[in-house]
Amino acid sequence: MMKIMMFVLLSLPFGNNEVADYETYDKELTQVSGETIHNVINTHFQTSFSFAATGDVLIHDHLYEDVETESGYDFISRVDEVAPYLQKQDLVFMNQETPIGGEDLRLSGYPMFNAPLEAADLLEYFDADIVSFANNHTLDRSTEGVERTADILNEKGIEYVGANTSPEDAERKRIMEVDGVEVGFLAYTYGTNGIPVPEGEDHLVNLIDMETILSDMEDLRDEVDMLVVSMHQGVEYEPYPRDEHVAQFEQIAEAGADIVLGHHPHVLQPVDIYEREDGGETVIAYSLANFFSAQQDLDTKLGGIIEFDVNHKQGTGDTTVEGVRFMPTYVHSEEYDNFELIPLADADEYGLEDADGVYQDVSDHMQSYTEELEIVEYLE
């Protein structure tokens, strides 16, 4: 309150360089209404930060074999062109598609994945704060794979959501704090590729069940200023979401999610700014596609970083997403060698045919549902 009053006093007009006497000063002060102070708080006491999210970190065997060195696996040198755009963010969310169990659990690619421990170094290098581990590959190494992944992420100081090591872990709320603003995260997957959840271990992975999701949201919503929900579902390689998935995303939006992030199709699907019945807005990214993988079709090499400007007014407690930008990315490779993650805007330098046309197609596609999404070559 001291800072607020000082601001109000300094803002009072004393006129033509005259020194106001105590009476004038006192009279002016009493005329400052509660509404004025309220407006000052909302205008000048606001927290703003950047939040960014990506699609799938999908570590195929071709990818880890390509980066293998005498001392381990050097993923980091292959992402230097894009990593700085995440490192500059205040909060970063990524989708960790594969278990990180290391060589003790036998490394493997498709269809049952297990990545080297150095995949966690990659996430750390991206400056990931929290990753979703709710996907169809969560149980590729069963209980031990979930536990190993959680352990290595904990060692790196990276939070995880959507998979859990115990019933107590499943009850733990994933809340990240940025400058005093509380951001809650939930994550779910449609299934685990037919691998059954071990008996008595339902906590291992969060499966999509709308009643459960809405209940979880209700439990978390009042404890946070912003709520992000990640949904691992959809149809692989389809460029647009199906009606049933749109309906679920919109139901989650109406239940109070500020941002809904989609994963699993491995290709980009449009972003929408959904207008809720309460007058607010929810940003829905139906599929953020692959971010770093070894898939070879052009559409599966395209991904991106979605960036949000988040504003929180301390006076009212209102938190809003004011700006949404998308920077397209591209995974260059020479078939299954020399993988490198780059901005799509630079792909012509790496030999991508009709790179400008591809960039324009991605821009048009991502803006199919709303032109409020800004497409940028590089994040500033």
What are the residue ranges of the model-derived segments?
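Acidic, metal/ion-coordinating pockets
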Residues: 15, 19-380
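Sec-dependent N-terminal signal peptides of Gram-positive bacterial secreted proteins and lipoproteins
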Residues: 1-20
